[in-house]
Amino acid sequence: MRHPDFPSQLAMTSAWHASLRLRFAARAGRTAMVERRHEGPLRVQKPLYPEGEICHGVVLHPPAGVAGGDRLDIDIAVASGAHAVLATPGATKWYKSLGRDAAQHVRIEVAAGGKLDWLPQENIVFDDARARITTDVVVAPGGSAIGWDAVVLGRQASGERWASGALWLDTRVGDPDRALWIEQSHFDGASPLRGAVAGMDGLHILGTLWAIGPGATQELAEALAEHLPYRADLRAGVTCLAGYGTATAQSMLLLRVLGSDMEAVRHLMIDAWTVLRQPMHGVPARPLRLWST
């Protein structure tokens, strides 16, 4: 019997190419979703306003998983004076690919005076999957953004080891003039680095949180670092990457996490976001309703 989380034969032989374009702007004292275009199975739910003028949206991918050959493109822009919060309702599953790469490309642009919280749930990379996850973030001086990504290698809840396959993580975060952080990582299921102390040390979950804007200071990084764990099953560290070259250059905080339990990693990242939101956006943190369901 086919596992309910495994794609049908049809899903493995066909491919989805889907895109979603979202634009946010300040209108009549609150943030409005002024443009939403989609092709294929990517959608966004009707905007909600649990924080008054801040616009909340939930990005939906009805197939719930990404199979070999699929490509998802998400393009987000936040204008000056607007504040958007975007999340996903569940984990993104990357299925066994039968040799074909699957890809997701997220592009984020925040204007001066704009604010964004990009808070998707984790990616679960199945054994034999080939996943390419690309994120490009450009935040103009005076704008701010907080976002994260987490990856679980293998269906750990089902006892599956990630023994074969490949994962590429390509991330760029910066301002219009320069990148403050560029990551180009390649994970191979059979690589000995996954078990090496200098690699993942046998842990199978990795998370990254970035926060870019005027509030990203060394003092904030040090305050956050005091509460981060460093033990065998959950490790985290934070650094401040300061801008340079001009008086308006952006700075960012970068939090990296390794763990063995997704719930623990998730709670750590939510706690960090809770600490960072006020100094980064000037708005107190309010946990998303999605996180309690």
UniProtKB/Swiss-Prot annotation:
Give the GO molecular function terms. nickel cation binding
Q: Which InterPro entries match?
A: UreD
Asked whether the UniProt record includes Cell cycle among its keywords, one would answer no
Keywords on record: Chaperone, Cytoplasm, Nickel insertion
Q: Where in the cell is it found?
A: Cytoplasm
Q: Which family does it belong to?
A: Belongs to the UreD family.
Question: Oligomeric state and partners?
Answer: UreD, UreF and UreG form a complex that acts as a GTP-hydrolysis-dependent molecular chaperone, activating the urease apoprotein by helping to assemble the nickel containing metallocenter of UreC. The UreE protein probably delivers the nickel.
HAMAP family for the chain: UreD
What is the name attached to this protein's record? Urease accessory protein UreD
Taxonomy-wise, where does this protein's organism fall, top ranks first? Bacteria, Pseudomonadati, Pseudomonadota, Betaproteobacteria, Burkholderiales
